[in-house]
A protein has these predicted regions:
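Condensing-enzyme catalytic core mediating Claisen C-C bond formation in acyl metabolism
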Residues: 1-90, 191-265, 269, 341, ...
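Short beta-strand segments
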Residues: 6-9, 123, 153, 178-185, ...
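Active-site-adjacent elements of ketosynthase-type condensing enzymes
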Residues: 24, 129-136, 181-201, 231-247, ...
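Conserved beta-ketoacyl condensing-enzyme motif
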Residues: 43-142, 282-298
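Short, well-ordered amphipathic alpha-helical segments that serve as non-catalytic structural scaffolds
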Residues: 45-49, 94-110, 210, 262-277, ...
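Glycine/charged-rich beta-loop-alpha catalytic/anionic-binding loops adjacent to active sites
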Residues: 82-83, 114-119, 141-153, 193-198, ...
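Claisen-condensing/thiolase-fold acyl-transfer catalytic domains that form or cleave C-C bonds
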Residues: 90, 100, 107, 125-127, ...
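Glycine-/small-residue-rich "gating" segment that lines the acyl/pantetheine channel
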Residues: 144-165, 172, 186-220
């Protein structure tokens, strides 16, 4: 069965930070001197992010310290911030609501009734709870209680593409199979305290959001977005360059300065080989949906593949407006490109711990 991406839905927290507000908040995590504070604020200005949604915000306006109560200023240089158990408590409350909203929008966009869903794939790397987001979606939207569930957990920013691979594998020839893939990420629950370069980069980029897509069998319409293929590549000698680990005070990311260099040096050879398996060359790809791990990641992809900056415009827009929402981000980008009627074939690329490249071909 050819999987068709029949409808997308997205959801964001009610309130948002500006990047300048977050720089001020995070400066309070570090108890830093004026020199380091200038360095931190410069990093935030260069991040490509303008605003970010966060479930920790309780009010839209007013003084920053009155709008949220989850994070406190560091008491001293050894203060690690909220415990992971406290962060997971917020995840358990907020993630199901956000995911259910995105899933409902995707079903409406695809004009698919909730009772028609046969398979549900949930994706998240920013929290754990059981019963989980899947059960909340089934009960909240009235999906059949026989819906087959799979959770793709802790795979990082490319997780939604792994989720689509799972949905694609459900297509065993039955035209009645309808898959709902839903990603929800609450990255702002993992803001880190202290002065650590990797943590500073993560604090400057990541945000909250949820996105969903409905997959069904093709009906022969020429305007359908069909999955033409998927691929994956574990970059050699890169195990320590991007990591995501559970700590006592939040999940902690390692993001080395080598990541853009690795992408620029390793991506082209694999993409050329993968596209050839589908009788395509890089020049044949009409549009690109690239996960914006940050501005340098986008630039590295453009240089590696020899494509114009214009091909990353939607990715940069999503990064600026919403920040890096981990695995949900690529679905935000695909949703926007589909609404813009982006030309095909389209290739989606996302990167995660490993370092791993995941790819999706849409025809």
């Amino acid at each position: 069965m050819t999987l068709v991406l029949a409808g997308f839905g997205t959801a964001l927290p009610e309130h948002r930070f500006t990047q300048a507000e977050l720089a001020e908040l995070h400066a309070g995590f570090c108890r830093i001197d004026e020199t380091r504070e200038r360095t931190l604020k410069a990093l935030y200005r260069r991040s490509g992010v303008k605003t970010r949604g966060s479930v920790i915000l309780e009010l839209a306006d007013g003084p920053l310290d009155a709008r949220q109560s989850f994070y406190h200023p560091a008491r001293d240089e050894h203060d690690p911030g909220p415990a992971t158990t406290d962060r997971m408590r917020v995840y358990a409350e907020a993630a199901p609501r956000l995911a259910t909203t995105a899933a409902a929008k995707a079903l409406a966009s695809a004009d698919v009734a909730a009772e028609a869903v046969t398979h549900l794939v949930t994706v998240s790397c920013t929290g754990f709870v059981a019963p989980g987001v899947d059960a909340a979606i089934i009960e909240g939207l009235g999906l059949p209680r026989t819906t087959q569930r799979t959770h793709v957990g802790f795979m990082g920013c490319h997780g939604a593409l792994n989720g689509l691979r799972v949905a694609h594998s459900f297509g065993d020839g039955s035209p009645d199979h309808v898959s709902l893939v839903c990603s929800v990420e609450l990255c702002t629950l993992h803001f880190s305290y202290g002065w650590d370069p990797d943590m500073m980069v993560a604090n400057a980029l990541f945000a909250d959001g949820a996105a969903a897509v409905v997959g069904r069998s093709a009906n022969g319409s020429g305007d359908e977005w069909r999955v033409g293929g998927m691929g994956t590549f574990l970059v050699p000698d890169s195990r320590g360059d991007m990591t995501w680990r559970i700590g006592d005070h939040g999940f902690r990311m390692t993001l080395s300065a080598r990541v853009p260099e690795l992408i620029q040096s390793q991506l082209e050879g694999w993409v050329v080989h993968w596209l050839a398996e589908h009788d395509l060359e890089v020049a044949d790809v009409a549009s690109w949906a690239v996960h914006p791990g940050g501005p340098r990641i986008l630039t590295s992809v453009e240089r590696a593949l020899g494509v114009d900056r214009d091909h990353s415009e939607v990715s940069r827009e999503v990064l600026a407006e919403h920040g890096n929402m981990s695995s949900a981000t690529i679905l935000f980008i695909l949703d926007r490109m589909r609404r813009l009627d982006a030309p095909r074939p389209c290739v989606a690329l996302a990167f995660g711990p490993g370092l791993v490249v995941e790819a999706l071909l849409i025809v």
